[in-house]
């Protein structure tokens, strides 16, 4: 057989090397992919599939990649630095596609409805709106940090899950809250009629199209591009300003934004308060009585958008706006944090006249539910509280606040309540109860409390007669152990002793007095629990007879060898001084003696103190 030429051998070797390197690269990529988060892996696989479908097409990151074995440049994709998710091109692209699909489905849904078709014809083409709204929604999603979304959910339940996406708005419109939605749209149409540059025809169009689902799109399409950008900003600001959600977040956000937009363009400030007062008396043409009640509620909510009902935005606007916003609602109705307005019946007024309340305590109680108001507005409220009938403030206090009491700070809440109680002996019952203060134990009628606080000093002549000396835990299943006189301890030890009541308690190294003056270690490896927890010093002392008969101290060499009989070492000649509880110990040891004689004669107990901690 002819020998294989040299060049062929080299070619084969090179091919083998290439195959090995390709295999190694594939293996490395597989490992890297397995360690990657799932979303990133999905992105890369999708991109590779796209590139594989059209091989000649240049990839955005790498050159051309064929569908065959991976190129050496392919690892550049895997090493690509992936920044914040909302800046990722692919995620943006996907989001835009999803939003366009959503919009198409919404438009189809709107076409099926007979009413608002005329309003749809007057709007700009769907293409323009599609360009506008995904950006608006995306920019809002990008601007809302996790903290703000958490704040948004701090409010009362019910509407927590409602976001501004039109799809969810559509679901919400089909739910039983449809009536309130319609009335809020009417009020929105009135608001926009007041805003600068609006014509009656436009507000009429808004009123006609109140059944349309994506309300935000209507608002955006009626603003110039600059204004719509400002409006998006206003939406995110509204998110920051309202940590407590109303019945519908979407409704209140659009309303707050619109009110603020009108207020900022300082032309209409004066007639705003008059309009608010007027709006409340307007009859609504085709709306049921229930709807008018809800409408008036939403109008009050608008009017208070810049008063001190818990909207922090008021702190950023001039104080006079807040004061003016309060005037229309003063004699009418007080809106609470939850957005529910409460009508006053004659019975309520009688109840108020029966128990009048000084305005200072009412003011304090108003602060305690966690209503966050600007300082100027708080002064305004204080001034109004003296002249105004007190039932308005009482109403604010009597409904429990939806904000968690931690907002007010439990200490401050308790202090305010104490002051209020000093001022007014019968405290208002419906106020949310303060967290119970950890005070002295209850009287001995309660068996649980007497067991928990057993031995705590309750003051002269209060409670059951207590034992002198330190406290000990009583386990009800066993007989009560005799109290051993020891160092008196502070009540802090009671708290330490209570949790471990059912467990077996081991003596710590501090509590064992070793005979013969051996080293007392800070912590023995046999000790369970830290010596700081138990302050008792149990001094163990043995009678001489028991020591002579029972205990052997084997020598070191015999222990190491473990061979032959273990030589006895004579016990320490000077046993420790007899202690007051020697007799008890002797009795116990005499009981244990036969057992000890049997067990310890055979093998001495070896305690290795050098074990690992």
Curated annotation (Swiss-Prot):
InterPro entries referenced in this protein's UniProt entry, alphabetically: Phostensin/Taperin_N_dom (IPR025903), Phostensin/Taperin_PP1-bd_dom (IPR025907), PPP1R18/Tprn (IPR026671)
Residue numbers carrying Phosphoserine: 54, 125, 133, 175, 195, 224, 368, 432, 490, 530
Keyword line: Acetylation, Actin-binding, Cytoplasm, Cytoskeleton, Phosphoprotein
Top-rank taxon: Eukaryota
Tissue and organ distribution: Isoform 4 is predominantly expressed in leukocytes and spleen.
GO molecular function, one term: phosphatase binding
A Pfam family that the UniProt record links to this protein: Phostensin_N
Annotated consequence of substituting residue 540 to G: Decrease binding to PP1. Complete inhibition of PP1 binding
One Gene Ontology CC term in the entry: cytoskeleton
Compositionally biased intervals (Basic and acidic residues): 18-33, 104-154, 167-191, 199-221, 266-282, 314-327, 340-350, 357-366
Compositional bias (Acidic residues): 580-589
Biased composition (Polar residues): 295-309
Biased composition regions of type Low complexity, renumbered to the chain: 476-499
Region: Disordered, residue numbers: 18-231, 266-500, 552-595
Phosphothreonine PTM sites in chain numbering: 199
Entry-annotated residues carrying N6-acetyllysine: 457
Biased composition (Pro residues): 424-446, 567-578
Subunit annotation: Interacts with Protein phosphatase 1 (PP1).
PANTHER family cross-referenced by the UniProt entry: PHOSTENSIN (PTHR21685:SF0), TON-B BOX DOMAIN (PTHR21685)
Protein name: Phostensin
Species per Swiss-Prot/TrEMBL record: Homo sapiens (Human)
Taxonomic classification: Eukaryota, Metazoa, Chordata, Craniata, Vertebrata
């Amino acid at each position: 057989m002819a020998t294989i030429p040299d060049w062929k051998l080299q070619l084969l070797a090179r091919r083998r090397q290439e195959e090995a390197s390709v295999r190694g690269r594939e293996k490395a990529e597989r490992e890297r992919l397995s360690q990657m988060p799932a979303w990133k892996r999905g992105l890369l696989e999708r991109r590779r599939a796209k590139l594989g479908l059209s091989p000649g097409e240049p990839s955005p990151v790498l050159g051309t990649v064929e569908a065959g074995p991976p190129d050496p440049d392919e690892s550049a994709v895997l090493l690509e630095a992936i920044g914040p998710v909302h800046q990722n091109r692919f995620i943006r692209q996907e989001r835009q596609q999803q939003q366009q699909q959503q919009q198409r489905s919404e438009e189809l849904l709107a076409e099926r409805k007979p009413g608002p078709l005329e309003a749809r014809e007057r709007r700009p083409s769907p293409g323009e709106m599609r360009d506008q709204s995904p950006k608006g929604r995306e920019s809002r999603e990008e601007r809302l940090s996790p903290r703000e979304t958490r704040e948004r959910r701090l409010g009362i339940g019910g509407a927590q899950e409602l976001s501004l996406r039109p799809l969810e708005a559509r679901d919400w419109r089909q739910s039983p809250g449809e009536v309130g939605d319609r009335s809020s749209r009417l009020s929105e149409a009135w608001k926009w009629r007041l805003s600068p540059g609006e014509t009656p025809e436009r507000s009429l169009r808004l009123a006609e199209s109140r059944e349309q689902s994506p309300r935000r799109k209507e608002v955006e399409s009626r603003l110039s591009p600059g204004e719509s950008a400002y409006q998006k900003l206003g939406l995110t600001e509204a998110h920051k300003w309202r940590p407590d959600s109303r019945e519908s977040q979407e409704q209140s956000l659009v309303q707050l934004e619109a009110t603020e937009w009108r207020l900022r363009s300082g032309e209409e400030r004066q007639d705003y308060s008059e309009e608010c007062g007027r709006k409340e008396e307007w009859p609504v043409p085709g709306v049921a009585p229930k709807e008018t009640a809800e409408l008036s509620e939403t109008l009050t909510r608008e009017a208070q958008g810049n008063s001190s009902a818990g909207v922090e935005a008021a702190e950023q606007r001039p104080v006079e706006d807040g004061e003016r916003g309060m005037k229309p609602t003063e004699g009418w109705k007080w809106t609470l944090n939850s957005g529910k307005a409460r009508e006053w019946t004659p019975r309520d007024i009688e109840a108020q006249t029966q128990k009048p309340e000084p305005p200072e305590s009412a003011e304090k109680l108003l602060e305690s539910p966690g209503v966050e108001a600007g300082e100027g507005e708080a002064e305004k409220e204080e001034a109004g509280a003296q002249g105004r009938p007190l039932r308005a403030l009482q109403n604010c206090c009597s409904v429990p606040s939806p904000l968690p009491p931690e907002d007010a700070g439990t200490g401050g809440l308790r202090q305010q309540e104490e002051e209020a109680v000093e001022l007014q002996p019968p405290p208002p019952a419906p106020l949310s109860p303060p967290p119970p203060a950890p005070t002295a134990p209850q009287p001995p009628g309660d068996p649980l409390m007497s067991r928990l606080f057993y031995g705590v000093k309750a003051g002269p002549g209060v409670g059951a007669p207590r034992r002198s000396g330190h406290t000990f835990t009583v386990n009800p299943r066993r007989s009560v152990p005799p109290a051993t006189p020891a160092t008196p301890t502070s009540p802090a030890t009671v708290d330490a002793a209570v949790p471990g009541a059912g467990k077996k308690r081991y003596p710590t190294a501090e509590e064992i007095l070793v005979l013969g003056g051996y080293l007392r270690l800070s912590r023995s490896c046999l000790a369970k629990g830290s010596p700081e927890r138990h302050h008792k010093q149990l001094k163990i002392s043995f009678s001489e007879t028991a020591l002579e008969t029972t205990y052997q101290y084997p020598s070191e060499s015999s222990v190491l060898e473990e061979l032959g009989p273990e030589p006895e070492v004579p016990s320490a000649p000077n046993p420790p001084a007899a202690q007051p509880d020697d007799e008890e110990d002797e009795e116990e040891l005499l009981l244990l003696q036969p057992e000890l004689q049997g067990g310890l004669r055979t093998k001495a107990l070896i305690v290795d103190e050098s074990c690992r901690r």
